[in-house]
Structures are given as C-alpha cells and as structure tokens.
Amino acid sequence: MTLDRDDNPAVPATASPWRFCVAPMLDWTDRHYRFLARQLSRHARLYTEMVTTGALLHGDVERHLRFEPAEHPVALQLGGSDPQALAEAARIGAEWGYDEINLNVGCPSDRVQNGAFGACLMAQPELVAECIGAMRAAVDVPVTVKSRIGIDHQETFDEFREFVDIVAEKGGAEVFIVHSRKAWLKGLSPKQNRDVPPLRPEFATRLKQERPDLTVVLNGGLTEIEAMHAALDQVDGVMVGRAAYQNVGLLAEVDRALFGDPRRVDRLAALQAYRDYVAAEIGRGTRLPTLIKPILTLFQGKPGARAYRRHLSEQAPKRADDPRVIDEAIEQLRWR
C-alpha cells in the first residue's frame, strides 16, 4: 500500500500510510491527545486507546468512538477474541469513519488475559486468523494486527514467522505492527513487560526481508528521530509509544524529518489551536484537568517549561472550567 497524497508532493511517492504512527496507549491516546497530535503532525497515523468489543456492543458507543474530523488518518484498536463480535465492532468503527481497524494481540495485562484477548492470542494463531478474516469481511477499511514477537516459551524468529504466516495466509492480514519485545504472561506486570524483555528489532526487519509482500511496522524503543529514520530503511513504518507523550513536542519534528515536508511546526500555534478546542470542550462539560494532560510536555527542554507545567498542574484542578489557565501558562514560557 502507498500513500495517495497529490495535495502534498513533499510526501515520498512510495511512502506507506504507516510510515509514522503513534501507538494506541491506554489512558493516553484519547481524542484530546489525538487532536493535539494532529496540530503537530499532518502525516502521523493516530490510534485510539484499545476499546473492547463488549464496550462497543453493550456500552456507550459515542463515548468510545467520538473523534474530530481533523484527526484523520485515525485507527480504532479493538480488543477481543470472538470473531463475530469483532466483526460487528469493526463494522461500527468503520461506520463512525475510522480509517483502519486494528486488532490488539500484544497487551499482556491480567485483565486482558482474563478476557482471553491481547498477547495471549499469540498462542492461538488460527483463532487470530479467523478474527481477522471476519473483520475484513465486515469492513472496507484496512484491518491490521499489532502483536508482540512472542509470549512466554516462544523465543525464536521461526515461531514468530509461523504466527505471521498463519494470520496472513488464513486471515488475509497484510499489515503487521510488531512490538519488538516478547511478553511474559505470568510474573511481569504490563509496565515490566514494556521494559524487561529485551528489544529484538531484528524480528521485524527480518520479517520484512522474508515477507516483502507484507507491510511491517516496527514498534518498541524508538525515542529519537534519527533512529526512526534509520529503521525506515528496513521496514515500512515506525510506531512510537511512550516517547510520544513523555515528550509530545517530538511530533513537531516528524513531518520535516520523516516526510520531507518543508513546513515548520510552531508549537505555540499548535497550543493556541488546542486552546480553542479546550474552550469548546469545556462548554460540553469536559473538565480542564483532563484536557491539560496532553500538553504538559509540549515545551520540554525549553526555557520556562517547568513553570509552564507547574502552573497547569496547580491551577487546572482549582479552575476546572477556565481555559484562561492555559493562557497564563503560556506567559511562563520565557523563550516566546
């Protein structure tokens, strides 16, 4: 798959739609974060937090799926293991306008395991293939897989390759987002599973070498633009997780560095656009402490960033319906 971006010739003609992605992250990649991210990068592919099939089929659909048109391209990540439930949830997501439906085969948490989905599905590639096949039959948008490189006893590339082959050949999956760590389902917390298992990016790069017909996206340990650029010589795309919220300003560098876009991103202008969004959201009943979370690290490393962050953190809980808190925080930035 290649990008069709006639309106923006700066994007390489052969660039994958997955060239740069922001990972789905629980408690982080909500619609507020994604709106800010889009002010910083026109080209990043954005993902929702994981939404379970039960939440969509039996819960508040609007709360889980609402998003702003500016967020495109945006993907919905689903958690589940029942093919028909996933197909119906995918259909709902596509009807809401999502550009992609992604299946979570990587989350190692006990709660997710108890629901029989996430990383534990790597032990059942035939079921994953059935799920992907059902989802693909239900929607016209791409259906993708995000997985680890293995679980527990699975150590070798051949085991990982077997999983991919089954899901690709029997399920029709064409896009694999590879978190280049294995997951220990017992004995490690989700946080430990993000750090303790060693990174094995060679699994993703070798997969691309051996299966050039697939779109392969590397996820895990990518924190610097230079490393992302180097990885793109070997895979179709990169996906960034924690670095995208620990230093959200990193996204302001992506379009120039990875897409050749000559436009310089003004972080202050991005914040002003987000401030207008905040005012509208407060009018709908959203509280300021929720809305400031994405912008706390926007100016990391800049003079006054600490005072800016402190003002937001201290004042937002006290004045939860006052967007002027953001204006006052901007005044703390000495480099303006």
List each language-model region with its residue ranges.
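Flavin-dependent oxidoreductase catalytic cores
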Residues: 1-336
